[in-house]
Design a protein with these regions (language model features):
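Ser/Thr/Gly-rich flexible loops in soluble cytosolic domains mediating phosphotransfer, phosphorylation
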Residues: 36-54, 58-69, 94, 106, ...
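Redox- and metal-dependent alpha/beta enzyme cores, enriched for Fe-S-associated oxidoreductases
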Residues: 74-80, 87-131, 181-189
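Short, aromatic/basic amphipathic alpha-helical patches
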Residues: 109-112, 152-162, 183
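A short, acidic, amphipathic alpha-helical segment used as a generic capping/interface helix at domain edges
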Residues: 126-139, 147-150
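Short, conserved loop/helix-junction motifs that constitute active-site signature segments
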Residues: 17-18, 47-51, 88-91, 136-138, ...
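Phosphate/Mg2+-binding loops and adjacent switch elements
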Residues: 1-67, 74
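Short, acidic/turn-prone active-site loops that include or flank metal/cofactor-
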Residues: 28-31, 71-72, 122-128, 169-175
Length: 195
């Protein structure tokens, strides 16, 4: 099969990767911070880099036509059957286990769905979990991101006796119609038709 299109997340720093289109998602809630690069700030590229790509504002309240936000779906049980999903109780105590770059966003997501009784357990971005990281003194469930769930699933398969519930909060990127229109226009200019 011939590939017509490759989409790379976090591909801006992969300079060897040839590209024709660059979209830069700018979190309007965080802004540009102190405008310094890692490790002094949280930027991966200088601010000037914004002028080289298409900037998509990430905020539900954005006034830019090129915007997106994350829509939260119902949590699902990572280590159980699908019929157990109805057992999710947002009023119980949770351990929020998270290994992402900006864990506060996950905590805000939990609060946005009415979940406020959670204890934060943060790990570095792209963390490789050990089963000991999921051991706590009581039997309260864990709640985590889909990104972390991808790393936790193989670990759970290695430890089939692990019986603490792990709930996953899925989010879906919702792009404005202007984003889809621009993408169609940019791809058409490259001779790629996705319709």
């Amino acid at each position: 099969h011939q590939l017509d299109l490759i989409i790379s997340d976090d591909g801006l720093q992969h300079w060897a990767l040839a590209r024709q289109i660059e979209w830069i998602v700018l979190d309007q809630n965080r802004g540009l911070g102190n405008q310094k690069l890692l490790p002094e700030g949280f930027l991966r590229e200088p601010v000037e880099r914004l002028s080289e790509g298409t900037v998509i504002e990430h905020a539900q309240s954005s006034t830019s036509p090129l915007n997106m936000y994350l829509e939260v779906a119902k949590p699902y049980l990572l280590n159980g059957s699908s019929d157990q999903a109805e057992l999710f109780d947002m009023h119980q105590d949770f351990y929020a286990v998270v290994g992402i770059g900006f864990p506060q966003r996950f905590y805000q997501t939990l609060e946005s769905i009415g979940l406020t009784r959670f204890q934060c357990h943060e790990f570095p971005d792209h963390y490789d979990y050990e089963i000991e990281d999921l051991q706590f003194e009581d039997s309260n469930p864990i709640i985590t991101t889909e990104k972390d769930a991808v790393k936790l699933l193989p670990l759970l398969k290695q430890h089939p006796d692990f019986n603490r519930e792990i709930w996953v909060v899925p989010v879906e990127a919702v792009l404005s119609q202007a984003c889809y229109d621009l993408l169609d226009e940019q791809l058409t200019a490259l001779g790629i038709n996705i319709s």
